[in-house]
Design a protein with these regions (language model features):
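Extended, non-catalytic subsegments within catalytic or DNA/protein-binding/adaptor domains
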Residues: 1-315
Length: 315
């Protein structure tokens, strides 16, 4: 019966859920309990995130149309938690492996930085990594999708320096996934073949993009071409395959950046600031927990000086 009710609930036209139609259904069918029934009947067949999206879509409809939302928060949470716990293994994505500095250093051996595409891809890789940014914030989804109000350009790059002389390169992202007003990401000079400053300077020298074009545009035989996410990943996969390395997903760059900064001993709250997280969701991306925590749990006080500096005095 529950399955039949759930099918009936979502077999109606999507504009108005059936339990909100007072002229065609009884009051019983308009009760939020029907939504709980739907979620429970689908638990085990869909991912928890998918069912949560269904749930919140209905709630959004209530908000937009001024209809009272009668669902109790505790009931809603219990239903969604159960659905998430019963999600089939096939609905869960495997954890993405982090890209490491060793991996980037290996890739560098397969790049000819005198070539326009390689110069752009390697600069994009190092900038995305050390700024802990999303790959989509520095690449385009398609060749003709460039919008100067959405995508970063050479004119959006500037430099800042603190009172101690520490210099950082800042990229003003016009708009991001979490902020329509844009956000700033940044990195500092690094020692090694993966230095983002050297890679960016080389890219500017080889490709010489104008100030109002996509930041990592590269010189193609047909003219200046924006770097798309597909082109970026294609070049990374090719280099990885030549080295016999596993092809990593784009989001592995952001995960790898988190891991690298934490392994350097950068405090968790600073890593949150670098990655622009307002909450603790970044903890979901963590890998190698034991290695990260190791310096803080040793029998010898190797982190004592650091702890004294970072911890506030007792009141």
């Amino acid at each position: 019966m529950a399955t039949h009710h759930a099918r009936d609930l979502w077999s109606r036209p999507p504009s108005i859920p059936c339990f909100l139609r007072p002229k065609t259904n009884s009051r019983r069918l308009r009760m939020p309990r029907r939504l709980i029934t739907h979620v429970n009947s689908c638990a085990g067949s869909y991912s928890g995130k998918t069912l949560a999206n269904y749930f919140y879509t209905v709630r959004a409809w209530h908000t937009l149309h001024g209809v009272p939302w009668l669902m109790k928060p505790a009931e809603m949470k219990a239903a969604l938690d159960r659905a998430s716990a019963l999600a089939p293994p096939s609905s869960r994505r495997p954890k993405r492996a982090p890209i490491t500095l060793v991996f980037i250093s290996s890739l560098a051996t397969k790049f000819d930085l005198s070539k326009p595409l390689d110069a752009a891809v390697f600069a994009c890789l190092t900038t995305t990594f050390f700024s802990a940014a999303r790959l989509g914030e520095f690449t385009l989804p398609a060749l003709k999708s460039f919008d100067p109000s959405l995508h970063v350009k050479p004119g959006d790059v500037y430099y800042e320096q603190d009172r101690n002389g520490f210099r950082v390169t800042v990229f003003k992202l016009p708009r991001t996934k979490c902020s329509i007003n844009g956000e700033d990401v940044f990195w500092a000079v690094q020692e090694g073949v993966y230095d983002p400053q050297a890679a960016l300077a080389n890219h500017f020298s080889i490709n010489n993009p104008l100030k109002d074009v996509p930041l990592f545009s590269w010189r193609h035989s047909s003219g200046l071409r924006p770097l798309t996410k597909t082109e970026f990943l294609k070049r990374i996969y090719l280099a990885a395959s030549e080295l016999g390395l596993e092809s990593l997903k784009g989001h592995g760059i952001r995960i790898g950046a988190i891991l690298e900064y934490l392994l350097r001993g950068v405090p968790f709250d600073v890593v949150k600031s670098i990655g622009r997280w307002s909450g603790n969701s970044f903890l979901l991306y963590l890998r190698q927990h034991a290695v990260i925590i190791a310096p803080f749990i040793q029998g010898t006080p190797i982190m004592e000086a650091f702890t004294r500096y970072t911890m506030p005095p007792p009141r």
